[in-house]
């Protein structure tokens, strides 16, 4: 019996009648402990068990974007780990990257509770969290500590993707006081087996304390900061965090901060992007996350702005404020009709619109602007739909909450099957293949 069946799932199921945010915080607390205690005997053992069950490593899933290597295209969307407290553990759960935040320059409590609701009938969630987080300074301190513990291997050490089954000769690599087992390289000229070549089995990633996958940082505007001073607010956060993330996201599309979506206007957004690029001495990739509710002409304007300011890509999309596609009529926790509840909808109802936006961006830019697709991904079919529409990378959050930690591996297995069925040798061949 795996750790999810024996421990995590019973906790989740027994807590379904509690405030979803309370359950979220308890889960995040456990993951935070694992992230911070990977050097301990127990933490090291648990980390290895997670990797064995949830990770799938295959060269066909790897991509390099913006000079950053992504071991697979499936990442954790912003919103789950707002303060980066579990930044060191997401790779062990199978994710190819993780996006932290949304973080604001000033720490803030967010909107009053309750502010997170499950819409089970719709396989969706409604949230009006309001960028609750401890602030950019607190996140920087945490990531600095992880950076100290991070394994410094540049370029990444290459190891054969061999199934770790005894008997197996191994080399011993001393890693920050912990010994990790690495498969011995095959003799020069010896051909790998088909199973090794395809890399269908997992292998023990060289993981010590710290970060093992690319980390994105999602930046938002502090609620106390006037809209007229938004550019300085974003710039201040970026200045604190720029050396601690692999890419950065300008979030101007959350419906839960008053006036924030108005910053998607080209004039307003240009001020923010100009300020960030002036601060961007390290040439970090900067993306913008857009709302699914924008008109096509507004999206086209943003794409022109992306070209003007040298943006690295677009994240499509954030949550929607639409309610017309919902089966849920009333929120049980409040007794109010769902149409009267403020907040953004994520999950299955967002799937088609976010895919349409991805396809539009791909076609408008002729595939020259990388897209991270997010919204309504629950299955390998959902993931493939977004990839072939034009998304180089994809993200999950609500689907992961509903389907559990096995979902990441299952989706990656399904994507590999799609590649095989179509005779494709890498995920990059599939990107945009359905948007010609």
Question: Which residues fall in each region the model found?
Answer:
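N-terminal capping/small domains of soluble enzymes
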Residues: 1-151, 212
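Active-site glycine- and acidic-residue-rich loops that bind
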Residues: 222-234, 262, 288-307
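Catalytic cores of alpha/beta
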Residues: 85-90, 294-306, 378-394
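C-terminal helical cap(s) of enzyme catalytic domains, especially alpha/beta-barrels
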Residues: 110-123, 325-340, 401-424
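Alpha-helix-loop-beta-strand connector modules within alpha/beta enzyme cores
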Residues: 124-126, 134-137, 142-146, 150, ...
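Glycine-rich phosphate-binding active-site loops on the catalytic face of alpha/beta enzymes
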Residues: 99-105, 313-321, 384-410
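Glycine-rich beta-to-alpha transition loops that act as phosphate-gripper elements at the mouths
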Residues: 78-81, 218-220, 290-296, 367-381
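Glycine/Thr-rich beta-alpha phosphate-binding loop at enzyme active sites
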Residues: 44-57, 252-265, 307-367
């Amino acid at each position: 019996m795996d750790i999810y069946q024996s421990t995590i799932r019973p906790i989740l199921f027994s807590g379904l009648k509690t405030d979803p945010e309370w359950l979220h915080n308890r889960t995040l607390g456990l993951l935070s402990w694992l992230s911070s205690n990977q050097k301990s005997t127990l933490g090291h053992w648990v980390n290895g068990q997670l990797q064995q069950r949830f990770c799938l490593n295959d060269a066909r899933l790897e991509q390099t974007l913006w000079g950053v290597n992504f071991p697979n295209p499936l990442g954790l969307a912003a919103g789950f780990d707002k303060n980066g407290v579990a930044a060191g553990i997401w790779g062990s759960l199978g994710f190819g990257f993780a996006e932290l935040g949304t973080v604001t320059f000033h720490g803030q409590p967010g909107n009053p509770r309750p502010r997170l609701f499950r819409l089970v009938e719709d396989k969706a969630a409604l949230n009006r969290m309001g960028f609750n987080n401890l602030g950019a300074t607190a996140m920087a301190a945490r990531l600095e500590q992880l950076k100290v513990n991070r394994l410094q291997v540049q370029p990444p050490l290459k190891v054969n993707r061999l199934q770790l089954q005894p008997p197996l000769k191994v080399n011993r690599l001393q890693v920050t006081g912990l010994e990790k087992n690495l498969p011995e390289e095959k003799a020069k000229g010896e051909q790998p087996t088909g199973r090794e070549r395809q890399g269908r089995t997992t292998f023990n990633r060289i993981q010590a304390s710290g970060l093992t996958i690319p980390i994105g940082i999602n930046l938002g505007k502090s609620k106390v900061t006037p809209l007229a001073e938004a550019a300085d607010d974003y710039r201040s956060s970026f200045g604190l965090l720029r050396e601690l993330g692999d890419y950065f996201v300008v979030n101007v599309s959350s419906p839960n901060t008053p006036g924030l979506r108005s910053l998607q206007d080209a004039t307003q957004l240009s001020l923010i992007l100009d300020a960030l690029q002036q601060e961007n001495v390290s040439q970090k990739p900067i993306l913008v996350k857009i709302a699914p509710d924008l008109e096509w002409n507004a999206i086209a304007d943003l794409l022109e702005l992306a070209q003007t300011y040298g943006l690295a890509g677009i994240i499509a999309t954030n949550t929607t404020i639409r309610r017309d596609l919902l089966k849920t009529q009333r929120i049980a926790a409040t007794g109010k009709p769902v149409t009267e509840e403020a907040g953004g909808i994520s999950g299955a109802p967002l799937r088609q619109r976010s895919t349409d936006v991805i396809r539009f961006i791909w076609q408008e830019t002729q595939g020259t602007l990388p897209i991270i697709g997010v919204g309504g991904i629950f299955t390998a079919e959902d993931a493939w739909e977004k990839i072939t529409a034009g998304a180089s990378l994809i993200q999950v959050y609500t689907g992961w909450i509903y389907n559990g930690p096995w979902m990441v591996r299952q989706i990656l297995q399904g994507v590999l099957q799609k590649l095989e069925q179509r005779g494709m040798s890498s995920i990059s061949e599939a990107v945009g293949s359905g948007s010609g």
